[in-house]
C-alpha cells in the first residue's frame, strides 16, 4: 500500500496574498469576497490576508512574481475575469496569464492559484462568481489553503 500524503484545510497561522484585477470588477469583487470568506472560515486571520488590485488580468503574473519574491506568503491567489469579445484579445490574455501564473509557482515553489474566470459571456462569468456555478474565488482560496498545507507535508516527508 502506498504512503498517502494529504493535507488539511486549516488556514490558521498562514499568510495569503490575493491579487485581483480591477477590470470587470463587478465579477472580481465577488471573487475576492468568496476568497476572503473561504480563508476566514478555514481559520485565516484578517491581518494575514493581503489584497492587491491590478489594472487587468494581464498584470497579475508580474505582481504574483513580486509577491512570491518577498517570501512572506504561504500561497498566492490570482483572481480575475476575462470575457470573450469579438477579437482574439481574449485568447492572448488567457494564454499569457495562465502561463505566467504557472511559471511563478514553479519558479518560487509557492502555490500560485489560478482563480481567473474565463468565459464566453458575461452571464457565464456572473454564474461563476457566486450564483449557479458556485464562487470560483472561494474554490481558488480553498485550493490555496490545501496546497500551502501540502507543501509543508511534502517538505517534512
Swiss-Prot record:
(2S)-2-hydroxy-3-oxobutyl phosphate binds at residues 86-87, 128. Belongs to the DMRL synthase family. NCBIfam families: lumazine-synth, PRK00061.1-4. Coiled coil: none annotated. Pathway: Cofactor biosynthesis; riboflavin biosynthesis; riboflavin from 2-hydroxy-3-oxobutyl phosphate and 5-amino-6-(D-ribitylamino)uracil: step 1/2. Catalyzes the formation of 6,7-dimethyl-8-ribityllumazine by condensation of 5-amino-6-(D-ribitylamino)uracil with 3,4-dihydroxy-2-butanone 4-phosphate. This is the penultimate step in the biosynthesis of riboflavin. 5-amino-6-(D-ribitylamino)uracil binds at residues 23, 57-59, 81-83, 114. It catalyses: (2S)-2-hydroxy-3-oxobutyl phosphate + 5-amino-6-(D-ribitylamino)uracil = 6,7-dimethyl-8-(1-D-ribityl)lumazine + phosphate + 2 H2O + H(+). Gene3D superfamilies: Lumazine/riboflavin synthase. One of its GO terms (biological process) is riboflavin biosynthetic process. The active site is at residue 89. Keywords: Riboflavin biosynthesis, Transferase. The keyword Repeat does not apply. One of its GO terms (molecular function) is 6,7-dimethyl-8-ribityllumazine synthase activity. Its EC number is 2.5.1.78. InterPro entries: LS, LS/RS, LS/RS_sf. The lineage of its organism: Bacteria, Pseudomonadati, Thermodesulfobacteriota, Desulfobacteria, Desulfobacterales. This is 6,7-dimethyl-8-ribityllumazine synthase. The gene is ribH. GO terms for cellular component: cytosol; riboflavin synthase complex. Pfam families: DMRL_synthase (PF00885).
Amino acid at each position: 500500500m502506498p504512503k498517502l500524503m494529504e493535507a488539511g484545510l486549516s488556514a490558521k497561522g498562514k499568510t495569503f496574498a490575493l491579487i485581483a484585477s480591477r477590470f470587470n470588477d463587478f465579477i472580481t469583487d465577488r471573487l475576492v469576497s468568496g476568497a476572503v470568506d473561504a480563508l476566514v472560515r478555514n481559520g485565516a486571520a484578517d491581518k494575514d490576508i493581503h489584497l492587491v488590485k491590478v489594472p487587468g488580468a494581464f498584470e497579475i503574473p508580474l505582481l504574483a512574481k513580486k509577491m512570491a519574491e518577498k517570501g512572506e506568503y504561504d500561497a498566492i491567489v490570482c483572481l480575475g475575469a476575462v470575457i470573450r469579445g469579438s477579437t482574439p484579445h481574449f485568447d492572448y490574455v488567457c494564454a499569457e496569464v495562465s502561463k505566467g501564473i504557472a511559471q511563478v509557482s514553479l519558479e518560487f515553489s509557492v502555490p500560485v492559484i489560478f482563480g481567473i474566470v474565463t468565459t464566453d459571456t458575461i452571464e457565464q462569468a456572473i454564474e461563476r462568481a457566486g450564483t449557479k456555478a458556485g464562487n470560483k474565488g472561494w474554490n481558488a482560496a480553498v485550493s490555496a489553503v490545501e496546497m500551502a498545507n501540502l507543501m509543508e507535508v511534502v517538505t517534512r516527508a
